[in-house]
């Protein structure tokens, strides 16, 4: 039985849906039992970067060089530090639209990037 990565759960209320390139947040206000739903769609490279960071940068800093190699070059895309900065900025903007804190992605100047999240859970399904 093969297991395939479907996405991730960040904290308890944000789901990363890889196949549909979506981030979905479902939060509730307990006093009124109201559910709030917010969702954003990500471009291909932005989603690839997010998947890479969720997989590799939750417990240590991942170098810019490693990110450029794995996210850009291994997907036959042209890589540069400027392009990395642009895509990280776009990802941070999308994350903020669904209520993620600005410091979810931390840039360690001269080193690389790390995620600031207490709980990232990969979600798999049977093929």
Feature annotation, model-predicted:
Residues 61-63, 79, 100:
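Alpha-helix N-cap and coil->helix boundary residues
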Residues 70-78:
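Short helix-coil junctions and helix-kink-helix linkers
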């Amino acid at each position: 039985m093969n297991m395939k990565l479907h996405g991730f759960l960040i904290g308890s209320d944000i789901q990363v849906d890889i196949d549909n390139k979506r981030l979905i947040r479902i939060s509730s206000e307990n006093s009124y039992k109201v559910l709030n739903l917010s969702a954003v769609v990500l471009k291909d490279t932005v989603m690839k970067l997010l998947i890479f960071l969720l997989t590799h940068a939750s417990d240590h800093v991942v170098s810019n060089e490693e990110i450029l190699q794995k996210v850009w070059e291994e997907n036959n895309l042209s890589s540069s530090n400027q392009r990395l900065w642009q895509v990280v900025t776009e990802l941070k903007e999308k994350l903020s639209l669904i209520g993620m804190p600005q410091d979810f992605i931390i840039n360690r100047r001269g080193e690389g990037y790390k995620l600031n999240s207490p709980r990232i859970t990969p979600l798999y399904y049977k093929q």
